[in-house]
Curated annotation (Swiss-Prot):
It catalyses: adenosine(1518)/adenosine(1519) in 16S rRNA + 4 S-adenosyl-L-methionine = N(6)-dimethyladenosine(1518)/N(6)-dimethyladenosine(1519) in 16S rRNA + 4 S-adenosyl-L-homocysteine + 4 H(+). The lineage of its organism: Bacteria, Pseudomonadati, Pseudomonadota, Gammaproteobacteria, Lysobacterales. This is Ribosomal RNA small subunit methyltransferase A. Specifically dimethylates two adjacent adenosines (A1518 and A1519) in the loop of a conserved hairpin near the 3'-end of 16S rRNA in the 30S particle. May play a critical role in biogenesis of 30S subunits. S-adenosyl-L-methionine binds at residues 16, 18, 43, 64, 89, 109. The keyword Cytoplasm applies. It is found in: Cytoplasm. Its EC number is 2.1.1.182. One of its GO terms (biological process) is rRNA methylation. InterPro entries: KsgA/Erm, rRNA_Ade_diMease-like_C, rRNA_Ade_Mease_Trfase_CS, rRNA_Ade_methylase_Trfase_N, rRNA_adenine_dimethylase, SAM-dependent_MTases_sf. Belongs to the class I-like SAM-binding methyltransferase superfamily. rRNA adenine N(6)-methyltransferase family. RsmA subfamily. It is an enzyme of class 2 (transferase). Keywords: Cytoplasm, Methyltransferase, RNA-binding, rRNA processing, S-adenosyl-L-methionine, Transferase.
Length: 262
């Protein structure tokens, strides 16, 4: 039984609604909601994932910016379970406040045009998030999960992997959506690391080092990081200044950012 409804996709909001039952079921299986958990879906759209999750779990919070979807979501959810709708831009939502002491599980088919800002916003509230299951452009998921030496290993890879375990789960083809996007999508799982295992002393300093390193990725670190690191930083961290950012492990960036010179 599918309770999703029909509504026109808005290009301005980057909307592509998932419509293929096979992939909907795979996402719900990947999330595997359990009693007592607090599920929060970002951008429910026509309810393709919303209603199967609600039917399985009984309660769900959704964050939807498109006001034209609020009433249809409310009406369709009424006979299924308890649906709480937060009508707001997701980047303005305080996930820590939404969690209210119970870590939330974030789920969503993220709008292509703001997927990276949403990921970094979720990281800002990592202490209130148990895990995340997101569908994004496959290209973005490839970057998120990439390792050193890969052509797509970059700032997004390092920033996310420093704070989360990142696992690419499966690819979703364009034909699974209405309207179909021009590229493949993929589902990814992110599990925030325990705070004690994230050894970053200064989050801003770490972000600055990573940004500078990949901002000029063809240059050696000595040149790319000239505004944020001195030669002594490399020596103390055990990082070669003649290496390039794409050659460094996440742990190398953390050590480099953590160095405090006297």
């Amino acid at each position: 039984m599918n309770s999703s409804f029909s509504a026109p996709a808005k290009k301005s909001l980057g909307q592509h609604f998932l419509a293929d039952r096979y992939y909907i079921d795979r996402i719900v299986q990947a999330v595997d909601p359990r009693p007592g958990q607090h599920l929060v879906e970002i951008g429910p759209g026509q309810g393709a994932i919303t209603f199967p999750l609600l039917r399985k779990h009984g309660a769900l919070t959704v964050i939807e910016f498109d006001r034209d979807l609020i009433a249809p979501l409310t009406d369709a959810a009424a006979p299924i379970g308890q649906l709480q709708i937060i009508h707001r831009d997701v980047l303005a939502v305080d996930f820590t406040a939404v969690a209210d002491g119970t870590p939330i599980r974030l789920v969503g088919n993220l709008p292509y045009n703001i997927s990276s800002p949403i990921l970094f916003h979720a990281l800002d509230h990592a202490g209130a998030v148990a895990d995340m299951h997101f569908m994004l452009q496959k290209e973005v998921v490839d970057r998120m999960a990439a390792g050193p030496g890969s052509k797509v290993y970059g700032r997004l890879s390092v920033m996310l992997q420093a704070y989360c375990e990142v696992t690419a789960l499966f690819v979703v083809p364009p034909g699974a959506f209405r309207p179909p996007p021009k590229v493949d999508s993929a589902v990814v799982r992110l599990v925030p690391r325990d705070a004690a295992s994230v050894l970053i002393k200064d989050r801003k300093r770490f972000a600055d080092v990573v940004r500078a390193g990949f901002g000029q990725r063809r240059k050696t670190l000595r040149n790319a990081l000239s505004t944020v690191c001195e030669p002594a930083h490399f020596e103390a961290a055990g990082v070669r200044p003649d290496a390039r950012a794409e050659q460094l492990e996440v742990a190398d960036f953390i050590r480099l950012a953590n160095v405090e010179l006297a």
